[in-house]
Design a protein with these regions (language model features):
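Hydrophobic, membrane-interfacing alpha helices
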Residues: 1-303
């Protein structure tokens, strides 16, 4: 007898376009960036940081998360398939023949590495404190992660082992007949809680806290959750290991988070958005551009 469970058979395509369409997964990715931009823009405005820095940061983050998450999935979880002469183009090609299918494999570990590398490049160019940015950026990344994981649930993918718990999902679209742990839903709920606590702390401190403190504990919380949920997952098994691949990948981030939190508590990380001062050349360039746009609008309104 099948225990009480949720029968899940949702269409993975949220918006149909011809033979294909926009999947829930891709929609979640877009919502994550839209809401993330809105929230971080308010943080920058609240702390009197030039909005031009955010416009540049958005491009860096979009490319870092997309490329990092996609490469992370292909390298860590499906290397044997993608890195072959027949399938390597599929790494970044979102079409199956003439049908748009989007990207059906993104890894949070790869996204995290991509973000860190992109911020290093951003810091080199814009002279902005990467630790300060990370404290604010990870708040919205947790929200984005929740949307993406909900997209996984709607796509009937990344679920766990069999369960007799009443909230087990029978993923009928995949031909499943036994309830499974909805691990994507577990992660989405956990990420929403991490987002709520991080945002609450940021607002409570009014943005005035030791640099690196949110980022450090965020790493511990998010990848700690990933480590625990992996116990009821099935993909990523390593022969001869009691831990799954996702757990081994999470451990360095947890340890790194603890180290960063310790340095932050001791005040050993650079404080403020511009500890060495702003890039005066860029600031002057943006000011001239803003003045030019302002004059154009004035002339247009006077006509």
């Amino acid at each position: 007898m099948i225990p009480l469970a949720i029968h899940w058979n949702v269409d993975p395509i949220a918006i149909h376009i011809g033979d294909g369409g926009l999947r829930w997964y891709s929609l979640g990715f877009l919502l994550a960036f839209g809401l993330g931009y809105w929230l971080v823009s308010h943080m920058f405005k609240r702390e009197n940081v030039n909005s031009h820095y955010l416009d540049s940061l958005l491009l860096y983050m979009f490319l870092a998360i997309l490329i990092g998450a996609r490469l992370g999935h292909c390298l860590f979880y499906d290397f044997g398939y993608y890195f072959t002469a027949e399938h390597w183009l599929e790494i970044f090609w979102p079409f199956d023949g003439s049908r748009f299918v989007g990207y059906q494999g993104l890894a949070s570990h790869g996204a995290a590495i991509g973000i860190l590398l992109a911020l290093w490049l951003y810091w080199r160019k814009y002279n902005m404190n990467a630790w300060w940015i990370l404290d604010r950026l990870v708040i919205v990344v947790a929200l984005g992660g929740a949307f993406v994981r909900l997209g996984n649930v709607f796509n009937s993918e990344i679920y766990g082992t069999a369960t007799d718990l009443p909230w087990g999902f029978i993923f009928e679209r995949n031909g499943e007949t036994v309830p499974k742990h909805p691990t994507g839903l577990y992660e989405a709920i956990a990420y929403l809680l991490i987002f709520a606590v991080s945002l609450w702390y940021y607002l409570r401190k009014n943005g005035q806290f030791k640099t690196g403190s949110i980022f450090g504990w965020w790493l511990v919380a998010l990848f700690g959750v990933r480590f625990l949920i992996e116990f009821v997952k099935t993909n990523g098994a390593i022969e001869g290991s009691v831990l799954l691949k996702g757990q081994w990948l999470s451990i360095p981030f947890i340890v790194g988070g603890l180290v960063i939190a310790w340095f932050a508590a001791k005040g050993r990380l650079p404080q403020g958005p511009f500890p060495k001062g702003e890039n005066k050349v860029l600031v002057a360039k943006w000011a001239a551009s803003d003045e030019k746009d302002k004059n154009k609008k004035t002339k247009k309104n006077n006509k």
